């Protein structure tokens, strides 16, 4: 069973690597075929979101936390390092020369930049992903209630499909605050939760079988 968790860790690391590589390559003038190939690094986003759902729900199954405890842990592991990076970036003179730098900093600290396209790309376009993952943290109780439904994964898929359809009909498919809203990736996150549930169930079955076999021996 440990090997499977190592696979999840590997997938997380590999997805981060592909995303970083994609942004790095697209910053330089490279041949068209390499540019097209680098775009596949975006698949790492989907893998990471699925792994996030898996890891968070497995942790919840092993040790349930209250909402306040959950947010505190996410604050220390994700939000605090994120804000430190933003503040350090703001101190670099040539990194951000915008006249609205203070507003941009505040938009990251108070998390309202995820709803304004003019602020979304401040301090690096790649920061959009942090906004999306934090949205999942903020609605964690809702995700638990949704997943506890008998067909929660299907509900999540339908919600994501409906959101994607609305975004397309509004002509906002290329607008980051629309196409990267958490509803777009809801089904992937919930699918990760489902896989964690299956993993936990199989672990308990294996442990039970080992107990029944080894105790008589």
Short names for language-model regions:
Residues 134-161, 196-214:
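Solvent-exposed interhelical
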Residues 56-64, 92-95, 142-149, 170, ...:
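Structural signal for the C-terminal ends of transmembrane alpha-helices
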Residues 11, 18-21, 47-49, 136-138, ...:
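Hydrophobic residues within membrane-embedded alpha-helical segments of Major Facilitator Superfamily
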Residues 39-49, 58-93, 99-112, 134-136, ...:
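Transmembrane alpha-helical segments and their boundary/interface "anchor" motifs
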Residues 33-45, 118-132, 170-191, 217:
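Interfacial loop-to-helix transition and helix-capping segments at the boundaries
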């Amino acid at each position: 069973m440990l090997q499977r968790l190592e696979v999840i860790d590997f997938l997380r690391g590999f997805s981060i690597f592909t995303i970083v590589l994609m942004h790095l390559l697209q910053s330089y003038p490279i041949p068209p075929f390499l540019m097209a190939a680098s775009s596949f690094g975006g698949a790492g986003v989907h893998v990471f979101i699925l792994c996030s759902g898996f890891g968070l729900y497995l942790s919840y199954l092993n040790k349930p936390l209250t909402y306040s405890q959950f947010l505190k842990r996410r604050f220390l592991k994700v939000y605090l390092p994120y804000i430190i990076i933003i503040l350090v970036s703001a101190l670099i003179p040539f990194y951000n020369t915008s006249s609205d730098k203070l507003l941009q900093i505040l938009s990251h600290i108070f998390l309202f930049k995820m709803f304004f396209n003019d602020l979304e790309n401040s301090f690096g376009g790649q920061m959009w992903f942090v906004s999306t993952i934090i949205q999942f943290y903020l609605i964690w109780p809702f995700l638990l209630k949704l997943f506890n439904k008998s067909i929660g994964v299907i509900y999540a898929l339908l919600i994501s499909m409906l959101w994607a359809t609305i975004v397309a009909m509004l002509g906002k498919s290329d607008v980051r605050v629309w196409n990267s809203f958490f509803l777009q990736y809801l089904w992937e996150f919930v699918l990760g939760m489902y896989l964690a549930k299956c993993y936990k169930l199989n672990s308990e079955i294996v442990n039970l079988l080992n107990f029944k076999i080894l105790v008589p021996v």
